[in-house]
Amino acid sequence: MVGQRIRIRLKAYDYRVLDTSTGEIVDTAKRTGAQVAGPIPLPTVKNKYCVLRSPHVDKKSREAFEIRTHKRLIDILEPTQQTVDALMRLDLPAGVDVEIKAFEK
């Protein structure tokens, strides 16, 4: 797989779960002999929601909620076949969204 690059993009609401997942991916890739660039922290997206507390009146009484989406980017340079096999067998925790793209140089 000479001249290829694998880009892995991870998203999660909990940064601790995200960091453990990125650590597992980086360790697996390094163990199989691939070069790793990252994990690169991408900007956190904050979605804010404002909801009325009362179902009928009291417009002034509101409750605010916020959900943060944390993201990380990992590039695997010069992956071997063992790297791809190990990444396919890797079991990541629930709550982590994984996007994998392969590029030719």
From Swiss-Prot:
Its domain of life reads Bacteria
The answer to keyword Plastid applying to this record is no
Q: Which N-terminal stretch is annotated as signal sequence?
A: none
The cross-references to Pfam families, in alphabetical order and at most eight, read:
Ribosomal_S10
Q: From the Swiss-Prot or TrEMBL record, what is one GO molecular function term?
A: structural constituent of ribosome
Q: Could you give a single Gene Ontology term from the biological process aspect?
A: translation
Q: Name one GO cellular component term.
A: ribosome
Write down the SMART domains for this protein, in alphabetical order. Ribosomal_S10 (SM01403)
From the UniProt record, list the coiled-coil ranges: none
Q: List the cysteine pairs that form cystine.
A: none
Asked if the Swiss-Prot or TrEMBL record annotates the protein with the keyword Membrane, the reply is no
Keywords on record: Ribonucleoprotein, Ribosomal protein
Q: Which PROSITE patterns match?
A: RIBOSOMAL_S10
Q: What does this protein do?
A: Involved in the binding of tRNA to the ribosomes.
Family classification = Belongs to the universal ribosomal protein uS10 family.
Q: Which HAMAP family match?
A: Ribosomal_uS10
Assembly behavior? Part of the 30S ribosomal subunit.
Q: Which PANTHER family match?
A: 30S RIBOSOMAL PROTEIN S10 FAMILY MEMBER
User: Which NCBIfam families would you find in this protein's record?
Assistant: PRK00596.1, rpsJ_bact
Q: Mind telling me what this protein is named?
A: Small ribosomal subunit protein uS10
Q: Which organism is it from?
A: Acidobacterium capsulatum (strain ATCC 51196 / DSM 11244 / BCRC 80197 / JCM 7670 / NBRC 15755 / NCIMB 13165 / 161)
User: Taxonomic lineage of this organism?
Assistant: Bacteria, Pseudomonadati, Acidobacteriota, Terriglobia, Terriglobales
